[in-house]
Amino acid sequence: GVDYVLGQNEKYDIPQLIEEIEKHASIASTQETHTNLQDKIRVAAIREVDDFHGVHSADDRTRCFIKVQDGCNYFCTYCTIPYARGKSRNPKIAEVVIDAQTALNQGAKELIITGVNIGDFGRSTGEQFIDLLRAFDQLDGDYRVRISSCEPNLLTDEIIDFVANSKH
C-alpha cells in the first residue's frame, strides 16, 4: 500500500518519513492496531510553503538548467501543480546570478532558465522576470540563454523586445 504521497517540497523530508514508517511498522508488528483511515492520511500545508530550493544541473554537458521558480498561483481546473508544488515562489535575482555565473565559470555555454511557470518570476521577491533576463544578459562569458515554460499571457512586449535584441 501507499504510506505517503509527497509534494515537491517534501522530498527533503523523506529520511525522517522513512524512520517514522519503520517505527510504526515495528510497533504494529508487536500489537494489533485498528486505525481509522483519517489517522493514516497526512496532508501537508502546501499553500503555506514559502521556501525555495534552487538547483542547477550541468554534469559534463555544456548546457545548464537553472531553476528560478517553483509553484503556481493559477488554480486551473485541469492542473494539480498548485496542490503538489504550492504557490509561486522564487529566489532573489542576486542568488540566481551567482548560480548562473558559477555554471559559466565551470564551462557552461547555454543557460536554460527553468521553473514551473517562469514568467511568474518575482512575485515572492518583488522583482520582475525582465530584470532576471537583464541580469543574465550581463554575465561574463560566451553563452546563450534559453527560456522554458513561460505562459504566453506573461510574455510582455518589453520581454519580447529585450530577447530579440539580447546579446545572448
What name fits each language-model region?
Residues 1-120, 158, 167:
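Proteins enriched for Cys/Gly/acidic motifs involved in redox and nucleic-acid/cofactor modification
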